[in-house]
Amino acid sequence: MIGSFLLLGALFIPIGVVLKGQSDGVVEYSQQYDGAGSIHTECGITEANTNQECTIDFTANQKMEEPVYVYYELSNFYQNHRRYVKSISYKQLQGKTDSADVSFTDDCQPLQYITKPDTTNPDTSKQILLSPCGLIANSLFNDVISTTTESIAAGFGMKEEGIAWESDVEEKYLQPDGFKYEECFDTVGDSNCSTLCNQEGWCGTAKEPYVDADSKKYAFFYPDDINIQYLYESYPEVVSPIEGVKNEHFIVWMRTAGLPKFRKLYGIIEKDIEKGETGEWCEYLWNGLFATFN
């Protein structure tokens, strides 16, 4: 019996040595940019619905080999609360959309609807179904973190794809049934985008084509958008209408944390950061702590 334990111990020693070496090789830098204790007073938010932008500098005291992972950290946020965890409609996240029969969203209580002015009668209001509904989806971390133009020019651009589980992206989160989009073009004397958007079944009610970061234009359609508010409408600074629930920041957020203090992956830098190099980050803020690892 003792011999068996000694043998097992001997087998685990090299594994422990390897894991310890990898752990010691991790380089971490973090800065709190909002809340009590933050030195970045320019980043603080004191009112709701405030767009606040600030820049944070990181100087590497050690070399960070690629890939460098960028995380945000929240504390005192109980994603593991029973009522919070249960407030989700998996059928809706799989594409089911029907504002006339919303029994499939019952699990989203207490957050299935929001009240908005009635577009047909400004003096009244109406309930609009949220898609996706529920507390998890509608408490999305919506700070926008990006490297500055100067950092991007120096090769420190941050990739925001490949941060979520591949199985989640491909199978678990699907755009609403009936959703479609198509790239369109505007030329002198011929507005393909306007033609598409004026056709029934495209671009929705009084919506303009979506223009991405590369200045490409897209006509798009979401079913029953008069009676449903979709994710891109709830978080226009974070989620585009073309990606919707396929947005990887959203998918990462939907994997709830087990503890009230947690980190979630935001992006990846695919370039070594040499000792002494300084990177600048733009923050469009909510509340959190920002960290980098390699």
Per-region residue spans from a language model:
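A residue-identity detector for tryptophan
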Residues: 165, 202, 253, 281, ...
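Juxtamembrane interfacial secondary-structure elements that flank transmembrane helices
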Residues: 19-35, 77-90, 291-293
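Generic preference for well-ordered alpha-helical elements
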Residues: 8, 65-67, 276
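Extended, hydrophilic extramembrane loops/domains of integral membrane proteins
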Residues: 70, 266-294
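N-terminal leader/pro-regions and domain N-caps
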Residues: 1-55
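Short, surface-exposed tryptophan/glycine-enriched loops
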Residues: 56-61, 249-258, 262-276
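Soluble non-transmembrane domains of integral membrane proteins
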Residues: 51-251
